[in-house]
């Protein structure tokens, strides 16, 4: 854990030469967290500490929007390395730093084919679902474990609230949430006329990002890529994109011989 890492650094006499970035995974066991673009899957803690951290930064907190992508440029700046202009990463402590929006994406994970994009601002969060022909909680590597196993059973028994059951219901192509009034992202405002101006703003922001990044997912996955996925995941590949395809041949396994070298025999004189 972080405490042991700090202990080891100090024991090595390197604490005053160290800046430590501590952040976490994003809720693998939570239903709408890992691999999804809701706040549960995007919002993680970040702590920056260390003996080499400038004194004026120690003990301070930030509440503005930042991207973990910015850890790269920030660490380069701390090390005195020039940040290339082409790099999307930004120095968190540079003068004038700020992000109006945070963009995120979800594509195929393992054998589960998906395409979701989102843009989050200080108050609103916009999500676009491209593959509305499948439910959010489609077959994935967590389907047979908890909490999905229990949640699915409760859904089949009609024991979930509408919000809890939404992951197995037909998805809206667009979602818009007021993070101040609805931090759990339950009430979708995308079809509410009162929020049309906000919706248009976030739509435009997302479209601009997709264009700037030349989003390749719009073309779908290659047949060879899908076939390779089938080779790796077999019967789990049930999305319609796999229909009519066959797995690529399994690569030949190389036999690795790990024998201990024989000791040289003593030569009798």
Task: Kindly label every feature range from the protein language model.
Residues 8-67, 88, 111, 234-240:
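Histidine-centered active-site microenvironments of extracellular/periplasmic hydrolases
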Residues 28, 72, 79-175:
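C-terminal cap/loop subdomain of S1 sulfatases and analogous C-terminal strand-loop tails that border
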């Amino acid at each position: 854990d972080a405490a042991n890492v700090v202990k080891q650094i100090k024991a090595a006499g390197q604490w005053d030469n160290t800046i430590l970035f501590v952040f976490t995974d994003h809720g693998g066991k939570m239903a709408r967290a890992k691999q999804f673009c809701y706040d549960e899957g995007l919002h993680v803690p970040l702590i920056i500490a260390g003996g080499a951290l400038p004194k004026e930064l120690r003990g301070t907190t930030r509440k503005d929007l930042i991207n973990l992508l910015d850890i790269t440029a920030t660490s380069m700046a701390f090390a005195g390395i020039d940040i290339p202009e082409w790099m999307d990463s930004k120095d968190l402590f540079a003068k004038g730093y700020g992000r109006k929006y945070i963009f995120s994406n979800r594509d195929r994970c393992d054998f589960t084919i998906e395409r979701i994009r989102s843009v989050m601002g200080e108050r609103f969060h916009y999500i676009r679902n491209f593959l509305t022909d499948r439910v959010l909680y489609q077959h994935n590597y967590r389907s047979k474990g908890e909490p999905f196993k229990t949640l699915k059973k409760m859904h089949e028994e009609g024991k979930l609230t509408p919000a809890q059951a939404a992951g197995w219901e037909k998805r809206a192509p667009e979602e818009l949430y007021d993070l101040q009034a609805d931090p759990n992202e339950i009430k979708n405002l995308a079809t509410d006329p009162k929020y049309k101006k906000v919706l248009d703003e976030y739509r435009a922001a997302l479209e601009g990002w997709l264009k700037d990044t030349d989003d390749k997912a719009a073309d779908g996955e290659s047949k060879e890529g899908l076939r390779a996925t089938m080779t790796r995941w077999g019967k789990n590949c049930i999305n319609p994109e796999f229909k009519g395809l066959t797995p690529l041949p399994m690569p030949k396994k190389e036999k690795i011989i790990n024998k201990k070298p024989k000791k040289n025999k003593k030569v009798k004189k």
